[in-house]
């Protein structure tokens, strides 16, 4: 049985105040073309379908279009909510969507039930586990000792052990310890939100979302597929791809990838103002790519951002690197500001006030308080 593993679409995302919606539709159309040429038995969507809990209407319409296209191809879809999503909004209409073979994780209320599929090798069970926080699990099992994210995941998986006679696929959205991160991801200080890869040992394949770099964690079959598009300049040198996973007889899993080509690449360019405005330099380049330009001029160029955008209309970020400034003084910095979590803000404040960092226990306690406050705000 063959699946396409996708995650972190982040529909509606803005990078340095540039809307990515047109680029997102372009890459989704490319993914549909891949599916037309590479048959699969289902699509796994491992969370962060949207970039915000309350997405813009255009993003909602784009996801609706994409799911409709998959349903018209009679492809089962297995989707979960991520930390950027509102679980309630993602789960809206889930019971109706099942009639079109679109299976969406409900708001977490207990151990996920397997969704059985069959092929010539027998039964394959798909488990949908939305993004988990310890408070969610304590609410369901108040007598369980759940303090950390690892405790929370371990508790849930104890209550839904996969049938050892069946092949099993888990779709989840957590930060697994040991994985590599990018600037555009939300990862808590001290790794308080991390879980251990060994918790997934009972599953044949674990389709993960949350991290934007494609990578395995521990074993080949515990995998982040990464984002289909680059969402930060820390990803500029990455090559995005679609991840296909095929499960044969029990224990046999193979993984292949197909490259994805964006409408506009996201690149870093370096040079002096004169070099970058020399037609011979840029004539054969994709000047409409999303760019981070670093100028090496010793003196600031007046109105450099506007003047460079005449040639490079999608210039997102402009820095200088010279003798006077070696600390990467950003002229536009919304990308980094959006990526700082509340815990990171408090941790920096605490260290400034106390001249020492938060301990792991303090960070875990603060993270718990932050989540409780946010939960109260969502319920208000």
Which ranges hold each PLM region?
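N-terminal active-site segment of His-dependent metallophosphoesterases
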Residues: 1-68, 72, 362-372, 376, ...
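Binuclear metal-dependent phosphoesterase catalytic core
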Residues: 112-124, 129, 222-287
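Accessory, non-catalytic peripheral segments of nucleic-acid enzymes
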Residues: 37, 42, 247-380
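His/Asp/Glu-rich metal-coordinating catalytic cores
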Residues: 55, 84-218
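A short helix->loop->beta-strand "cap" motif at the edges of active sites that frequently abuts
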Residues: 72-77, 166
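Divalent metal-coordination and catalytic microenvironments
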Residues: 8, 28, 43, 48, ...
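Glycine-rich phosphate-binding loop signature in dinucleotide/nucleotide-binding domains
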Residues: 35-39, 119-120, 162-165, 284-286
């Amino acid at each position: 049985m063959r699946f396409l593993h996708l995650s972190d679409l982040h529909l509606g995302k803005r990078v340095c105040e540039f809307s990515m919606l047109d680029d997102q539709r372009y890459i989704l159309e490319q993914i549909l073309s891949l599916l037309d040429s590479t048959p699969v038995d289902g699509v796994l969507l491992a969370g962060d379908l949207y970039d915000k809990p309350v997405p813009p209407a255009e993003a909602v319409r784009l996801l609706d279009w994409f799911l409709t296209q998959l349903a018209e191809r009679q492809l089962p879809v297995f989707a979960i909510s991520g930390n950027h999503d509102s679980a309630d909004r993602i789960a809206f209409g889930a019971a109706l969507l099942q009639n079109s073979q679109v299976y969406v994780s409900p708001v977490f209320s207990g151990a996920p039930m397997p969704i059985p599929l069959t092929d010539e090798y027998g039964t394959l069970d798909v488990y949908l586990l939305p993004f988990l926080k310890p408070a969610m699990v304590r609410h369901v099992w108040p007598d369980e000792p759940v303090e950390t994210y690892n405790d929370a995941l371990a508790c849930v998986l104890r209550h839904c052990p996969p049938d050892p006679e069946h092949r099993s696929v888990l779709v989840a959205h957590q930060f697994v310890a040991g994985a590599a991160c990018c600037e555009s991801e939300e990862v808590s200080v001290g790794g308080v939100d991390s879980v251990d890869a060994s918790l997934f040992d009972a599953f044949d394949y674990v389709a993960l979302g949350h991290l934007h770099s494609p990578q395995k964690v521990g074993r080949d079959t515990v995998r982040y597929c990464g984002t289909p598009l680059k969402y930060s300049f820390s990803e500029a040198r990455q090559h995005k791809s679609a991840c296909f996973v095929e499960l044969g007889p029990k224990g046999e899993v193979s993984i292949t990838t197909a490259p994805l080509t964006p409408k506009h690449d996201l690149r870093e360019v370096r040079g002096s103002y004169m070099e970058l405005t020399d037609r011979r330099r840029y004539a054969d380049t994709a000047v409409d790519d999303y760019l981070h330009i670093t100028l090496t001029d010793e003196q600031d160029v007046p109105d450099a951002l506007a003047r460079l955008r005449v040639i490079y209309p999608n210039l997102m970020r402009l820095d200088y690197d010279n003798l006077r400034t070696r600390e990467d003084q950003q002229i536009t910095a919304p990308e980094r500001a959006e990526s700082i979590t509340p815990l990171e803000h408090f941790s920096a404040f605490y260290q400034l006030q106390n001249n020492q960092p938060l301990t792991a226990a303090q960070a875990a306690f603060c993270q718990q308080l932050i989540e409780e406050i946010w939960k109260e705000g969502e319920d208000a």
